[in-house]
Regions:
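Cleavable N-terminal targeting peptides that direct proteins into the secretory/outer-membrane pathway or into
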Residues: 1-30
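Transmembrane beta-strand segments of Gram-negative outer membrane beta-barrel proteins
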Residues: 36-37, 136-141, 157, 163-178, ...
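Extracytoplasmic beta-strand/coil segments of soluble accessory domains associated
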Residues: 74-115, 137
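Short acidic/polar hinge/loop motifs at secondary-structure boundaries
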Residues: 115-143, 162-163
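Transmembrane beta-barrel wall of Gram-negative outer-membrane proteins
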Residues: 171, 178-209, 214-252
Length: 266
């Protein structure tokens, strides 16, 4: 079965970070006293370690780079409590995750707070997000029920994948990975760094191809990422992110029986 997902999966997100204080002073009327008030406004949906009262784990970018290797992205969560992830043997990008026994249809998976579960059955097609591991800055996994502003069925838990912003440090990297069954991955990334006017940009391109251990599981995938940042001062930061991961892969949906193996081979 040949699954072609060259329909580009694209996330474009704007992030505004604003911190400010507002000074309100009531005008004096008659004998009333002046009232001074400070109003602080902020929104944060990221759990803080040892402060937010939920069972949550945070996987940093350094951990992903060190331990992922040629595994599929969900498999990095196997060291997380109450999480089970597997390739499932079907093909490239056909992984699945269980949290506390609940399958993906009962887990809310989000990228920068945007749900990516299928709108019909709630499933997650990781083959559409094969390049997300290259652009992830951190990932939080909340186990069990939690408060959410979105109408999502997340009785098993919630995953929020945060992508990189434009890197403030200038530099680049080129990587090449090789594995069994013709697996190879090449990646190029470059960061301009933040200039004197507050502008910064990051760019990444990657290609992954090869096959799994089973016959007929060839695949090829690409990943592109661009981020543009503007920080005019210390309290304002504007980030624009654009990423996508077109790919195709052959899928092994069912294993042959012993009788079929004897008659037709593998």
């Amino acid at each position: 079965m040949n699954l072609n997902f060259f329909k580009k999966s694209v996330i474009a997100s704007f992030t505004f970070t604003i911190a400010g204080s507002y000074f309100v002073q009531a005008q004096e009327v008659g004998n009333e006293r002046d009232i001074e008030e400070i109003v602080l406004v902020g929104v944060a949906d990221i759990a803080k370690h040892r402060k937010t009262p939920v069972a949550v784990s945070t996987i940093k970018e350094t951990t992903i780079i060190e331990k992922l290797g040629n595994q599929e992205f969900p498999e990095i969560l196997n060291n997380t409590p109450s999480v089970y992830a597997t390739k499932a043997g079907g093909g490239f990008g056909d992984s699945r995750i269980n949290i506390r026994g609940f399958n993906q249809r009962n887990i809310a998976v989000m990228v920068n707070g945007i749900p990516i579960n299928d709108m019909l059955n709630g499933d997650v097609y990781w083959s559409n997000w094969t390049g997300i591991s290259d652009v992830t800055s951190s990932m939080q996994v909340q186990r069990g029920l939690g408060a959410s502003k979105l109408a999502i069925v997340s009785v098993g838990g919630t995953m929020n994948i945060l992508t990189r912003s434009a890197d403030k440090k200038k530099g680049g990297v080129v990587t090449l990975g090789l594995g069994n069954d013709g697996y190879h991955k090449s990646l190029f990334a470059y960061n301009t760094g933040k200039n004197l006017k507050g502008w910064s940009a990051s760019f990444l391109m990657a290609r992954t191809a090869g096959a799994l251990y089973a016959d007929g599981t060839d695949f090829e995938g690409y990943n592109y990422y661009f981020a543009l940042g503007y920080q005019p001062n210390k309290i304002h930061d504007l980030q624009f992110t654009f990423t996508g991961a077109p790919q195709w892969h052959h899928q092994r949906g069912a294993a042959p029986t012993i009788n079929e193996y004897i008659n037709y081979g593998s």
